[in-house]
Amino acid sequence: MILPMPPEPHRTIVRGWAILAVTALALAGLALIVPAASKVPALQNAVAWPDAFFQKGLVSHVALSFIVWFLAVLALISLTALRPPDRRDPTLPGAAGLVLAVLGTLAIAGAPLIRGAEASLNNYIPSIIHP
């Protein structure tokens, strides 16, 4: 049985989650390349890197590539599989969730630049501790 296409606002939210998933992977790659460049001997002393930039960049890389990507793909698959009921408009809660996820992704991507923060390199999910 072929289901009918969902309404346009629903497709826009699904598209937003797909863009967030791809953007999280791109930022995760950048969050790995830039801290790795901070360990190159020619660049190590030429650029004033923040304190513990490599460790905090590694935390940001893992959080973006593991947590944000998986949750964005989960939202994408869930919204694709579950059709919104006709009597409710899922646009507002769906858009609010997407906006909050984008803001959280930007906060994770900017976390290595926070001064005074300390990277806690745990086994599975590392975190950044800030007083």
Sequence positions of predicted segments:
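Membrane-interface helix termini and inter-helical loops of multi-pass transporters
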Residues: 45-48, 120-123
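Non-cytosolic membrane-interface motifs at loop->transmembrane helix junctions
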Residues: 121-131
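Hydrophobic cores of alpha-helical transmembrane segments in multi-pass integral membrane proteins
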Residues: 15-43, 51-85, 89-117, 130-131
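Extramembrane terminal tails and long inter-domain/linker segments of multi-pass membrane proteins
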Residues: 1-14, 46-49
